[in-house]
Amino acid sequence: MGIKSIVINEQQIEEGCQKAVNWCNAKFNNKKVIVLGILKGCIPFLGKVISKFSFDLQLDFMAVASYHGSHVQKQPPKIVLDMSHDPKDKDILLIEDIVDSGRSIKLVIDLLKTRHAKSITLISLIEKIKPKAFDINIDFSCFKVKDNFLVGFGLDYDGFYRNLPYVGVFEPDNP
């Protein structure tokens, strides 16, 4: 499969997701929030946390394309699916699978700012430990990991491996 090693196992994912739920429930207590999942990678993470959120929410999605069938970001990211709710004067909770360079999520945050969102909060399953190309404030991350190419639990290589119940280091030359 090309998986060199597992860096976050199933039990760790469960624990990290519960910590994210606790943090969000405390932050958004008695608020109405648009939970904005960034497709496609957010699906497993969002699925684990959304049913445990205790605040009022509307669910929405955006899709940002940046890798285009490789593990190297070759082109500037672009919005390929926009959200359906109007973010104006709303609290937005962004759900992201991974923050790597910050390019893709910065595009989303900048767009939400131009649309006059009341507040923008970013939680991510994974944050890579490396300098970000852009100044991004990650309000909560479940895991901070070294700069490897990762797959599993929403993270993919050319659309594959998202369904793995863990996160692993991927090497294309390691079948």
From Swiss-Prot:
Stored Pfam families: Pribosyltran (PF00156)
Signal peptide span: none
GO-annotated cellular components: cytosol
EC number(s) on file: 2.4.2.8
Highest taxon in the source lineage: Bacteria
InterPro entries, A to Z: HGPRT, Hxn_phspho_trans, PRibTrfase_dom, PRTase-like
Location of the active site: 100
Subcellular location: Cytoplasm
The UniProt record lists the keyword Transferase: yes
Gene3D superfamilies the UniProt entry points to: 3.40.50.2020
GO-annotated molecular function: guanine phosphoribosyltransferase activity; hypoxanthine phosphoribosyltransferase activity; magnesium ion binding; nucleotide binding
Residue numbers binding diphosphate: 40-41, 162
Cofactor: Mg(2+)
Residues engaged in binding Mg(2+): 96-97
Reaction catalysed by this enzyme: IMP + diphosphate = hypoxanthine + 5-phospho-alpha-D-ribose 1-diphosphate; GMP + diphosphate = guanine + 5-phospho-alpha-D-ribose 1-diphosphate
Keywords assigned by UniProt, alphabetized: Cytoplasm, Glycosyltransferase, Magnesium, Metal-binding, Nucleotide-binding, Purine salvage, Transferase
Record pathway: Purine metabolism; IMP biosynthesis via salvage pathway; IMP from hypoxanthine: step 1/1; Purine metabolism; GMP biosynthesis via salvage pathway; GMP from guanine: step 1/1
One Gene Ontology biological process: IMP salvage
UniProt: GMP binding residues: 128, 149-150, 156
Disulphide linkage map: none
Family indicated by similarity: Belongs to the purine/pyrimidine phosphoribosyltransferase family.
Reported function: Purine salvage pathway enzyme that catalyzes the transfer of the ribosyl-5-phosphate group from 5-phospho-alpha-D-ribose 1-diphosphate (PRPP) to the N9 position of the 6-oxopurines hypoxanthine and guanine to form the corresponding ribonucleotides IMP (inosine 5'-monophosphate) and GMP (guanosine 5'-monophosphate), with the release of PPi.
PANTHER family named among the record's database cross-references: HYPOXANTHINE PHOSPHORIBOSYLTRANSFERASE, HYPOXANTHINE-GUANINE PHOSPHORIBOSYLTRANSFERASE
The protein's name: Hypoxanthine-guanine phosphoribosyltransferase
Lineage per the UniProt record: Bacteria, Bacillati, Mycoplasmatota, Mycoplasmoidales, Mycoplasmoidaceae
